Curated annotation (Swiss-Prot):
Changing residue 383 to R: In HMNDYT2; no effect on protein abundance; no effect on subcellular localization at the plasma membrane and within the cytoplasm; decreased manganese ion transmembrane transporter activity. The chain crosses the membrane at residues 158-178, 187-207, 225-245, 398-418, 425-445, 461-481. Residues 31-157, 208-224, 419-424, 482-492 are extracellular. It is found in: Cell membrane; Apical cell membrane; Basolateral cell membrane; Early endosome membrane. A motif (XEXPHE-motif) lies at residues 376-381. It catalyses: Zn(2+)(out) + 2 hydrogencarbonate(out) = Zn(2+)(in) + 2 hydrogencarbonate(in); Mn(2+)(out) + 2 hydrogencarbonate(out) = Mn(2+)(in) + 2 hydrogencarbonate(in); Fe(2+)(out) + 2 hydrogencarbonate(out) = Fe(2+)(in) + 2 hydrogencarbonate(in); Cd(2+)(out) + 2 hydrogencarbonate(out) = Cd(2+)(in) + 2 hydrogencarbonate(in). A motif (HHHGHXHX-motif) lies at residues 251-258. Glycans are attached at residues 77, 87, 102. Residues 179-186, 246-397, 446-460 are cytoplasmic. This is Metal cation symporter ZIP14. It comes from Homo sapiens (Human). Ubiquitinated. Ubiquitination occurs upon iron depletion. The ubiquitinated form undergoes proteasomal degradation.
């Protein structure tokens, strides 16, 4: 036995056993560190010491503790129920939590009350309900901070609408140049520019705003650019195929002139009809108050067909002296003029709605929408002016009614600002986005192709094709730049 006690291995095992027993004793461990023993009550006392006074907390001090933990920040009066019980996975307000524990303004929360309140705090933290509530509140605060002031909204809105409305007065300035080649090519560029801006504005800004998300998030801009790329790819491919097929057909029929020599060309036929228009032979195309002063005869059937193929500018140029030298009674003005004026006024009202709602969101949202509408209104107002003249109005009347319909944009601006300031503007953005897509693709795209037909008949296909591409890509680039860098450019 003595030998066993003196054995080194036994002594080592005994020493390790005694050391283990000493380490597992809390008092021994605490005394080894020179620190007092930690108890469960110590944590409660620490909270009361940091947030309260003495040995208790007031209701406001407990609320400060909850705010620090992001608990009790709900809107209050929660009425959600799940199978007859209140949904506890909801962010409650501090008032709701205090009511559940029968706390009043005069209550003092001591250790026992705080210990009973701790499971409530733990449940709210575990449900993470208040985390999403805080994120939503922060996003709302950031949105409110980013919104322009009322002065900026009305000031920039009125300025943009005024510039757009002045486009209606530009129609008279271009009448002398309507027969020039550069006028039709300039008009072609502006139509293509309008298509690019309207389509891109709806794609990059109006549609995402209608659905309520930021277009700069989740690669939306790059994906929308691919959507525009698909549209542009098919447009480019179709035009190239038409150019190649036209050249092939011309080469194939290059020696078949015997049939066409016996018939006058379409250009010669149109020039003959224009000469008759100037001489007053086609009196049914001229207003009654003018045809009574001119000698006329009934046109042939072929001449009616040719007249139908003439552009509005051709007819207007032949009748300009009759329209401009004499006043026109309202009863002599065609119904088409009043239909154009009313429809244009409604169109401008919706444009104003889109501009007003856009400026309530941000200044750059309003500017980008205004740029798209301006690019669309410039060729649109020029075309309306010519149609009003051709329908029987004098220059003064056409300018007045064209400007009057343009002023409907002011009324739409006021409604858009009021609706965007007090209600959700998403519905207005959805309406404007659909309208922009329709105008660009269903209305202006065929008009762009129609303007190109005369150049295509003359054989100059490449120049109109280049102008179309420049207009489309310019409009697309403007909208992309305004969308990508709207938050980095400061105004004022």
């Amino acid at each position: 036995m003595k030998l066993l006690l003196l054995h080194p291995a036994f002594q080592s095992c005994l020493l390790l056993t005694l050391l283990g027993l000493w380490r597992t004793t809390p008092e021994a461990h605490a005394s080894s560190l020179g620190a007092p023993a930690i108890s469960a009550a110590s944590f409660l006392q620490d909270l009361i010491h940091r947030y309260g006074e003495g040995d208790s907390l007031t209701l406001q001090q407990l609320k400060a503790l909850l705010n620090h933990l992001d608990v009790g920040v709900g809107r209050g009066n929660v009425t959600q129920h799940v199978q007859g019980h209140r949904n506890l996975s909801t962010c409650f307000s501090s008032g709701d939590l205090f009511t559940a524990h029968n706390f009043s303004e005069q209550s003092r929360i001591g250790s026992s009350e705080l210990q009973e309140f701790c499971p409530t705090i733990l449940q709210q933290l575990d449900s993470r309900a208040c985390t999403s509530e805080n994120q939503e509140n922060e996003e709302n605060e950031q949105t409110e901070e980013g919104r322009p002031s009322a002065v900026e909204v009305w000031g920039y809105g009125l300025l943009c609408v005024t510039v757009i409305s002045l486009c209606s007065l530009l129609g008279a300035s271009v009448v002398p140049f309507m027969k020039k080649t550069f006028y039709k090519r300039l008009l072609l560029y502006f139509i293509a520019l309008a298509i690019g801006t309207l389509y891109s504005n709806a794609l990059f800004q109006l549609i995402p705003e209608a659905f309520g998300f930021n277009p700069l998030e989740d690669y939306y801009v790059s994906k929308s650019a691919v959507v525009f790329g698909g549209f542009y790819l098919f447009f480019f491919t179709e035009k190239i195929l038409k150019i190649l097929l036209k050249q092939k057909n011309e080469h194939h029929h290059g020696h078949s002139h015997y049939a066409s020599e016996s018939l006058p060309s379409k250009k010669d036929q149109e020039e003959g009809v224009m000469e008759k228009l100037q001489n007053g032979d086609l009196d049914h195309m001229i207003p009654q108050h003018c045809s009574s002063e001119l000698d006329g005869k009934a046109p042939m059937v072929d001449e009616k067909v040719i007249v139908g193929s003439l552009s509005v500018q051709d007819l207007q140029a032949s009748q300009s002296a009759c329209y401009w030298l004499k006043g026109v009674r309202y009863s002599d003005i065609g119904t088409l003029a009043w239909m154009i004026t009313l429809s244009d006024g409604l169109h401008n009202f919706i444009d104003g709605l889109a501009i007003g709602a856009s400026f309530t969101v941000s200044v750059f949202q309003g500017i980008s929408t205004s740029v798209a509408i301006l690019c669309e209104e410039f060729p649109h107002e020029l075309g309306d002016f010519v149609i009003l003249l051709n329908a029987g109005m004098s220059i003064q009347q056409a300018l007045f009614f064209n400007f009057l319909s343009a002023c409907c944009c002011y009324l739409g601006l006021a409604f858009g600002i009021l609706a965007g300031s007090h209600f959700s503007a998403n519905w207005i953005f959805a309406l404007a986005g659909g309208m922009f897509l329709y105008i660009s693709l269903a209305d202006m795209f065929p008009e762009m192709n129609e303007v190109c037909q005369e150049d295509e008949r003359k054989g100059s296909i490449l120049i109109p094709f280049i102008i179309q591409n420049l207009g489309l890509l310019t409009g697309f680039t403007i909208m992309v730049v305004l969308t990508m860098y709207s938050g980095q450019i400061q105004i004022g």
